[in-house]
């Protein structure tokens, strides 16, 4: 997808905020713990290749990604620190990962057997992390016998280096710690079955650290907090207070490209879902659902100049319209998303409007949007 650098619409990413969030996370670790910055999904929409060096400078000890291709992107960006893929990859890609010093997760004995054939053929050793399903229900070993079989298979097997063992918490961002405690107990049980001792045991995610639920983890996988966003932010929920202040890094700005007056009874947008109740001023903004600004944003208020104005009519593929209180000139700045967490158009408020989480909103902003990096 081409990046539209010649239109007046861009995501602004505050590098000073990214640095500060990374430093704060690093400072909050216990002695000996490593900080692995999670930059999957293009750093939650913020730009992984651009931000990873910034995080590295601010103290990152390694990086986590969702898939091998994301790890390869970091290597091309000259990142040399450890990279862990969190999602399962085809066994056929084991050699490519090993050749680029990228660690892969393991969830089955069958995968190991297939990967070993590939590695033996190329004369390579792969760093692996054993994934444990302690209660997320997603990937990982959950049955004792399966895990014991893998443990036995890895004894003396030089095709693999058991670098880590990990799990992921389903509810570390909840005030109710009962399920969190259950997962910790289940993980420790699985750990007791392992005689091939990993270099790193890691369970802590952003929520576990921000809400002081650290479980003696060698690595902290710090994700959404890097971008200044509170993981405890489901729609309608009460945010848990983080252990340190977070600084949102993303804002989304554009401008009015066209302003016109319409008369009473005139329709706006596909399906004419807005009908003017009187003579009205309508402004057009050159952003649409093809950029990730989806149709459900109809009715949401964006900041035009100093005034919050509702989106009227259905959001189009490449444009949307706003109802203005009066005539304003084309070229007037429009702030779609504010980096101020208290603003009515913050990423959190946008997520509330869409009945989702801010993770999803940030990730849906795609590569057609230019990303401008400020405050270097």
UniProtKB/Swiss-Prot annotation:
Keyword annotations of the record: Isomerase, Pyridoxal phosphate
Cofactor: pyridoxal 5'-phosphate
One Pfam family per UniProt: Ala_racemase_C
Chain sites annotated for binding substrate: 138, 317
InterPro entries: Ala_racemase, Ala_racemase/Decarboxylase_C, Ala_racemase_C, Ala_racemase_N, Ala_racemase_pyridoxalP-BS, PLP-binding_barrel
Modified residues (N6-(pyridoxal phosphate)lysine): 40
Reactions listed under catalytic activity: L-alanine = D-alanine
Pathway recorded for this protein: Amino-acid biosynthesis; D-alanine biosynthesis; D-alanine from L-alanine: step 1/1
Entry annotated with the keyword Transferase: no
CDD domains: PLPDE_III_AR
Keyword Isomerase in annotation: yes
Top-rank EC class of the record's enzyme: isomerase
GO biological process, one term: peptidoglycan biosynthetic process
A GO term for molecular function: pyridoxal phosphate binding
Active site: residue positions: 40, 270
EC number: 5.1.1.1
CC annotations in GO: cytosol
Physiological role: Catalyzes the interconversion of L-alanine and D-alanine. May also act on other amino acids.
UniProt record similarity statement: Belongs to the alanine racemase family.
NCBIfam families: alr
Protein name listed in UniProt: Alanine racemase
